[in-house]
Structures are given as structure tokens and as C-alpha cells.
Amino acid sequence: MLEFLRKLIPWVLAGMLFGLGWHLGSDSMDAKWKQEVHNEYVKRVEATASTQRAINEISAKYQEDLAALEGSTDRIISDLRQDNKRLRVRVKPTGTSEGQCGFEPDDRAELDDRDAKRILSVTQKGDAWIRALQDTIRELQRKQEIK
């Protein structure tokens, strides 16, 4: 029995050393992978925060553009008047002449100031919205290219 124990002790020690090495190696690899996953997570969070900051800047610029549009429609209309230009729309003629008189009606009417301001305001707001949307799309595409 003593002889058996003498032969068994080196194998038990070797098994214990192997198990200890395995345990230390697996802890080391776990720590390495956890660190790598954490670094990837931090990169994604920073990229998301960066993109959100850029989108917030675009949104703030869009709000500033909308606030700046308030007086610009009046300025555009007054500039058109100074140049002796009018905003007109086509209208359906009320009637036609029976003969060949050679006269063709203009079929246009000048827009009321309120309607002109409203139309200009809508178009300018639409342009500002489209610019903000395009900036947002560019920023999101830039984020995808970084990945």
C-alpha cells in the first residue's frame, strides 16, 4: 500500500499542478475577453454619444433657421416689390371671345400679401427641414462608415 501511495503522489501532484495551471489560464483568458468586450462597448457608447451630439447640433441649427425665417418672408416680398415683380398665379379664364380678335387673356392674378407670405413661409420651412434631414442622414451614414 505504501508503494502504491508513493507511485500515486507524483500523479496527484501533477494533476493538481495541471488543474491549477488550467484554472489560472482560464481566469486570464476570461479577464482578457471581458476587457475586450468592455472596450468594444465603450467604443459603441462613445460613437453613439458623438452621433447624438451631432444630431442635437443639427436640430439646434434647424430651430435657429426656423426662428430666422419669421422676418425673411416680409423681406423677400419687399425685395420683389422694389424690383417691380409680383407673385402671380394662373387662373381659369371666365370666358372666351367668339371671334378671332387676336387677343389672348393673361389668365393670371396677383397673390394677396397674406397668401404670398404664407406660401413663402411654407416653402422656406420645407427647405430648412430638407436641409436638416439631409444633414442628419449624412451624420448617420458617417456613423455607419466608422463601424
From Swiss-Prot:
Its main location: host cell. Residues 1-7 are cytoplasmic. The chain crosses the membrane at residues 8-24. One of its GO terms (cellular component) is host cell plasma membrane. The keyword Transmembrane applies. Keywords: Cytolysis, Host cell inner membrane, Host cell lysis by virus, Host cell membrane, Host membrane, Membrane, Signal-anchor, Transmembrane, Transmembrane helix, Viral release from host cell. The keyword NADP does not apply. It is found in: Host cell inner membrane. It holds the Pfam family Phage_lysis. Interacts (via C-terminus) with the spanin outer lipoprotein subunit (o-spanin) (via C-terminus). Part of the spanin complex which spans the entire periplasmic space. The spanin complex is composed of spanin inner membrane subunit and spanin outer membrane subunit. Belongs to the T7likevirus i-spanin family. Component of the spanin complex that disrupts the host outer membrane and participates in cell lysis during virus exit. The spanin complex conducts the final step in host lysis by disrupting the outer membrane after holin and endolysin action have permeabilized the inner membrane and degraded the host peptidoglycans. Host outer membrane disruption is possibly due to local fusion between the inner and outer membrane performed by the spanin complex. This is Spanin, inner membrane subunit. It comes from Enterobacteria phage T3.
